[in-house]
Amino acid sequence: DALPISFKKHSAAKSVHHGFMGGLLEHTLSVTDMCQYFAEHYPMIHRDLLITAALFHDMGKIQEISDFPMNDYTDDGQLLGHIYIGARCMENAAAQIPNFPPKLKNELVHCILAHHGKMEFGSPKVPAIMEAMALHMADNADAKLQTLTEVFTQAGDNMGWLGFNRMFESNLRKTSEE
């Protein structure tokens, strides 16, 4: 099966965060690590649900974005988007497991549908269960911190203000070394 190879080599985005070869795997592992932390520190969290959702939350990106060197949106990506594609994949995977609990399937699908947190950020649903909120927070934190890392790496030795950044709605600079 080509899926594991594609997953390892795929980017997590065309641009913005983790838009490099292997970015999808790096992002997925970072999000999963954060979710593991949440599950350890908040006993109400259903650990298996959250970790499964973390591992598969961006699976739809394999169909949404073409492989390198193109790394551009596919027709499925333009028409459907990775959230819908990922939710559909999760439903199909659960259907292959005999007696998979329907409520658990819906909760997994909900986590994928809600992982961007807000409808204006592309989520068709906002988080309604603790695991969906934890996944959203981990996904958002990793995406933003990686984006800042990329911005500051591009700035090189520039320790001054870098100018207004639309994504962060702020003028940015690196932390001083003092």
What is each model feature region?
Residues 16, 37-155:
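Divalent metal-dependent catalytic cores for phosphoryl transfer on phosphate-bearing substrates
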Residues 6:
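Long, charge-dense, solvent-exposed interaction surfaces that engage phosphate-rich ligands
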Residues 9-39:
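Loop-centered beta-sheet repeat module
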